[in-house]
Amino acid sequence: MRPLDAVELAEPEEVEVLEPEEDFEQFLLPVIHEMREDIASLTRERGRAPVRNRGKLWEMDNMLIQIKTQVEASEESALNHLQGAGGAEPRGPRAEKADEKAQEMAKMAEMLVQLVRRIEKSESS
């Protein structure tokens, strides 16, 4: 490799030099305004996130309450059906199976409620 000759170097392009005030108004002010808008947007978004999370937790809590209510209603319905069908008769395998299913559903609903409460607790701290 040979060294470059001074003549071979490209001459720098002439750049229009602006007055400091023009430079500030033309280039820096728009950037500053854009940055302020970005900061304001991020601040608003940061403020909305906890509200959105609380809304989701509220929805989950309502859903769990509905599930628990449905489980209790179906359990009560199954018990009423069994009592109406054969009041004094001994319970059969279907009745025992229905009781087991109702207990499993109640346990699942309770676990879901506990999960939501843990999530709420971790979100609040």
Curated annotation (Swiss-Prot):
Residues 94-124 form a coiled coil. Residues 76-99 are annotated as: Disordered. GO terms for cellular component: nucleus; perinuclear region of cytoplasm. Its main location: nucleus. It is found in: Nucleus; Cytoplasm, Perinuclear region. Found in a complex composed of MORF4L1, MRFAP1 and RB1. Interacts via its N-terminus with MORF4L1. Interacts with CSTB and MORF4L2. PANTHER family: MORF4 FAMILY-ASSOCIATED PROTEIN 1, MORF4 FAMILY-ASSOCIATED PROTEIN 1-RELATED. Belongs to the MORF4 family-associated protein family. This is MORF4 family-associated protein 1. It comes from Rattus norvegicus. The gene is Mrfap1.
